[in-house]
A protein has these predicted regions:
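Intrinsically disordered, low-complexity regulatory segments
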Residues: 1-185, 446, 454-456, 465-468, ...
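NTP-handling and nucleic-acid-processing catalytic cores
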Residues: 13-18, 195-228, 232, 390-391, ...
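C-terminal or mid-to-C-terminal helical accessory/interaction module adjacent to the motor/catalytic core
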Residues: 95, 103, 150-233, 270-274
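Metal- or metallocofactor-binding catalytic centers and their adjacent structured scaffolds
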Residues: 164-165, 249-279
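Structured, charged N-terminal subsegments at the starts of enzyme catalytic cores
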Residues: 276, 281, 285-293, 302
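Basic, low-complexity terminal or inter-domain segments flanking catalytic cores
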Residues: 2-5, 24-26, 127, 137, ...
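Active-site phosphate-binding and catalytic loops of NTP-dependent enzymes
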Residues: 25-28, 135, 163-168, 189-192, ...
Length: 778
């Protein structure tokens, strides 16, 4: 009898697995083995992005500590990638895992299965860092944690893993993790080449989003509404007859309209056409559809996650856009109940056989769809958040549409007997099919209204304009991201395209293919979009401003976003082809066809090129946006001073301001000085006493010593306060008190009794170098 630990990704997953295993207190038995179910809370270990010097040799500390651009690019080989640090908020979780792992003969990773290998990395981290890699490590693959039969089967069929650094999925996920870490260099570049004080975060997806929106806004700004004129015909029902290559005229008066007369309409053909139901929704398109109802993307993501954890929806971060035959069969018994719940007549769901377009072998979790737990009523879902009901209804109707018949319409074509080159067509609905259930939220559909052809059509002068680019919306953005490099309207980075083609050819020769497409998964797209629309705060202070804002559903760049956009032209990090390269490299690394370290080294080339390109872009950007930069703005002035027989770098600033020359001289002489600063919270001035002293703080590397200004507390008040005893002093009263005179004040209020009294007031010494108000009576 062996003891096996099942490691889940998060508490909710552990609860579901425990329920499926019939565990009591997260302990049970199966097939004669003892089972202990434990969990992480996402990634328990991470790279310390706040101090990357922990990961490099001591002789390279200064290079990686400094934000000076001369220290770029980084060398991926300089980093000790094993130096992951535990999150500060997971000590108890790690303690529990260490206790349980020490009791076990085997550890089974049962985290989420995703196409990037993240679940594998997340599972290996605590096993490796806590020192249990020597034990038998297995992996259970499943797609739905709420499915008892499936999870038990996955556990019974678990696969023994190779050592961590030989595990193909770990290598794939670790490469992506390290690539994104090293890409922080681009953010250092944009801060330095921006206004030197604003963080402008960059990354494969972040930069692509800014680039796509910025390009569209630039197209709109450059658009010129230049009219042209031509002859068209219109029948009595408003149908327009157009000639494909009609001559265009710059002025309306130039159009020879008198040469045309009324034409007779004749039907020249009819054709019955069908459209199949739209694709199943990704999380990004679901979020964009709900944004139009006023729901923030962040709220939708959180609510969907809770719906999933309760079994009402399937795995949100899926990359799949279809379901498997087994998943299709599992849904069939639930269809009528779901339909009645969301207001769909089950009799309309007559296509209950798998569609080749929506049901395929392969994939992992299957596309987003309702879960196996069907609520008794929609109000039951409101406990999960304001968007919960709308999420479920949209998701359900989207899936139910695949069980309805095709939309069928008759396309009628007509022309004019006298001018046969002038044609028109209309679509006449015959069977609504799936359109009676669901409106495709992934496209902007045109009106379904139509009118039959009239008998005749009259000529008229048509004023036309070049089509104006549509305003960017979240739905539009997600469509562009799904297109990947095909969304690129500019010049492609040929070096990336060529390298990607080489890797794809290599994969094809060995029978592999890239499972991911577009720029990011649907869940990642929605998550990064949400990040870019809100400020990031640390200890109440904004460290990163929003880059995008949505105004009545239309996307705009903030001033920070515009700054970032104008730094991106012709860069590799802003290339829409970059993610496709990374996906190809991930797949090849997993397949053992490429070396992870060599792929990471390629980033040096991108950084070198982008640094030069952004320097050129920076000059244009600062000129366009009227940004003046002080090269010293982001540097604290320091001076090397000898203190207690040792040299120290000592800051000449405190409280956001520089010490005056006299204050600095007094501090260096060992004197205690008074310093007045403005409170960041109250905006009022305050005065403190302080001196230079050796101090210390506890950091991740242990106790760190430094010499700096020591705040000794507030300085004694030497002038009259603004008020006392409920009485607000006038300027004249304060002037008299400050020169030692006595004033008489009526209706002073006792703080102890609340009673009013009259008294003589005088400003006297308080015995501590300051002044205080002293009352006297009589």
């Amino acid at each position: 009898m062996a003891t096996i630990a099942i490691l889940n990704e998060k508490p909710s997953q552990a609860r579901n697995i425990a329920k499926n295993f019939g565990a009591s207190g997260f302990r049970t038995t199966r097939n004669g083995d003892n089972i202990i179910i434990v969990h992480a809370v996402g990634h328990l270990y991470q790279y310390d992005t706040s101090d990357i010097t922990k990961m490099v040799p001591a002789d390279k500390y200064d290079k990686y500590k400094s934000w000076d651009l001369k220290n770029l690019p980084w060398h991926a080989s300089d980093f000790d990638w094993d130096k992951l640090v535990p999150r500060s908020d997971v000590k108890d979780v790690l303690k529990n895992l260490k206790t349980v792992f020490s009791q076990c003969d085997e550890i089974c990773i049962m985290t989420d299965v995703d196409p990037t290998g993240e679940g594998q990395v997340l599972g290996w981290e605590p096993i490796d860092k806590l020192g249990f890699s020597h034990k038998k490590i297995t992996r259970a693959y499943f797609s739905d944690e709420t499915d008892k039969e499936q999870t038990l089967k996955a556990f019974d069929n678990r696969v023994k893993l190779k050592p961590m650094k030989q595990d193909p999925e770990w290598k794939m996920g670790a490469f992506r993790q390290r690539w994104d870490f090293v890409s922080m260099q681009f953010s250092r570049i944009t801060r330095n080449l921006g206004d030197k004080k604003t963080n402008l975060p960059q990354g494969r997806l972040k930069s692509a989003i800014i680039r796509i929106i910025g390009d569209r806004l630039a197209e709109i700004k450059a658009y010129k509404k230049i009219p042209s004129y031509q002859v068209k015909f219109k029948d009595s029902n408003g149908n327009i007859f157009t000639k494909g290559d009609a001559e265009q005229y710059p002025k309306a008066d130039d159009v020879p309209i008198k040469d045309f007369k009324t034409g007779n309409v004749q039907l020249v053909g009819t054709q019955t056409k069908k459209t199949t139901p739209p694709a199943l929704l990704t999380l990004s398109f679901l979020s964009s559809a709900l944004e139009s109802k006023g729901y923030k993307t962040d709220e939708v993501l959180k609510t969907y996650q809770m719906l999933y954890q309760s079994g009402f929806c399937t795995y949100p971060r899926t990359e799949d856009k279809f379901v498997t035959p087994d998943q299709f069969d599992q849904m069939l018994p639930l269809i009528d109940k779901i339909a009645n719940l969301v207001g769909v007549n089950p009799k309309e769901l007559t296509h209950r056989k798998p569609r080749k377009t929506h049901v395929k072998e392969g994939g992992v979790h299957g596309a987003n769809r309702p879960g196996k737990n069907v609520p008794n009523n929609l109000q039951e879902l409101s406990q999960f958040g304001p968007s919960a009901i709308d999420i479920y209804v949209l998701l359900a109707r989207n899936y139910l549409a695949t069980l309805a018949e095709d939309y069928e319409y008759e396309q009628q074509k007509a022309n004019l007997k006298e001018y046969p080159e002038y044609t028109s067509s209309i679509s006449v609905p015959k069977k609504l099919g799936w359109k009676s259930i669901y409106t495709d939220v992934s496209i902007d559909e045109e009106s379904e209204e139509y009118k039959s052809f009239g008998r005749t059509a009259d000529p008229y002068v048509y004023e036309g304009f070049p089509p104006k680019p549509a305003q960017p919306t979240m739905k539009w953005l997600m469509t562009q991201l799904d297109k990947g490099s095909k969304a690129n309207t500019g010049v492609k980075k040929e070096a990336i395209v060529k390298r990607t083609e080489e890797i794809l050819k290599l994969l094809n020769e060995h029978g592999h293919k890239v499972e991911t497409s577009g720029i990011g998964t649907g869940a990642t797209q929605a998550s990064i979009y949400s990040d870019l629309t809100k400020a990031k705060k640390v200890k109440g202070k904004i460290v990163t401003h929003p880059m995008i804002k949505s105004v009545k559903g239309k996307l705009q760049l903030t001033s920070q976003g515009q700054m970032s956009y104008e730094l991106l032209p012709d860069t590799y990090i802003g290339s829409l082809e970059l993610t496709e390269l990374v996906y190809a490299e991930m797949t090849a690394i997993k397949a053992g066809l490429l070396n992870m370290d060599k792929c990471l080294d390629e980033i040096e080339f991108f950084v070198k090129q982008d640094l030069q390109t952004m320097m050129i872009n920076s000059e244009k950007m600062r000129k366009n946006l009227n940004i003046e930069v002080n090269d010293l703005v982001d540097q604290k002035e320091k001076e090397v001073l000898e203190f207690e027989g040792k040299e120290w770098n000592v800051s000449r600033e405190w409280g956001g301001e520089r010490f005056t020359d006299q204050q600095w001289a007094d501090l260096k002489a060992g004197k205690t000085i008074e310093v007045t600063r403005i409170s960041a919270k109250t905006k009022n001035p305050y005065t403190v006493l302080g001196k230079l002293s050796k101090q210390s703080f506890k950091g991740d590397k242990g106790t760190v010593e430094y010499v700096g200004f020591e705040n000794l507390g507030f300085a004694p008040k030497k002038e009259c306060p603004n008020s006392w005893g409920g009485h607000v002093f006038t300027d004249d009263e304060k002037a008299k008190l400050n020169v030692g005179e006595t004033i008489y004040v009526e209706k002073l209020k006792s703080a102890k009794t609340g009673n009013f009294y009259n008294a003589n007031l005088k400003l006297e010494d308080d015995g501590n170098g300051g002044k205080k108000i002293v009352p006297s009576f009589g």
